[in-house]
Amino acid sequence: MAFNFGHLLIAGLVALSAVSSETIQLQPTQGILIPAPLAENIRVSRAAYGGYGAAPAAPSYSAPAAPAAQAYSAPAAPAYSAPAAPAYSAPAAPAYSAPAAPAYSAPAAPAYSAPASIPSPPCPKNYLFSCQPSLQPVPCSAPAQSYGSAGAYSQYVPQYAVPFVREL
């Protein structure tokens, strides 16, 4: 069976919903294996903060026991050290420095220029939706014919030619 990202996502969602919905509480007869130092840290921190309603545990440190009697040790042997060797230092290596790297500067950014403008197509004159005005104003001396008329506009009714589109 191939493993893919979908399986990982589903497993993550199931695990997240299980963890977020309830806290898993182990019974005293159940257990998990954890390293001893980690278990000791957990035990100490639970005791320090009153975990499980128990009184804080006493620290697990005890002072070393006092010696029972004076221990006997033999007299120390005379210390012997070899004569000091003459100090030797290697001759200093000649100082070397790499040649300086040539100074580099990035090429200058090109000056900004506005993009070339795209010419608009010519305005159709006889289509249904056109950029040409369909109502032509007339001089204000023309009398209005009635209250509901076009007023200063002529009674010109534009004729539209809808382009014929043939399907293939």
Curated annotation (Swiss-Prot):
Signal peptide: 1-23
Originating species: Drosophila melanogaster
Major place of residence: secreted
GO terms of biological process kind: chorion-containing eggshell formation; egg activation; response to bacterium; vitelline membrane formation involved in chorion-containing eggshell formation
Alphabetical list of Pfam families matching this protein: Vitelline_membr
Propeptide, residue positions: 24-42, 155-168
Protein name per its UniProtKB record: Vitelline membrane protein Vm26Ab
Keyword Repeat part of the UniProt annotation: yes
Keywords associated with the record: Disulfide bond, Extracellular matrix, Repeat, Secreted, Signal
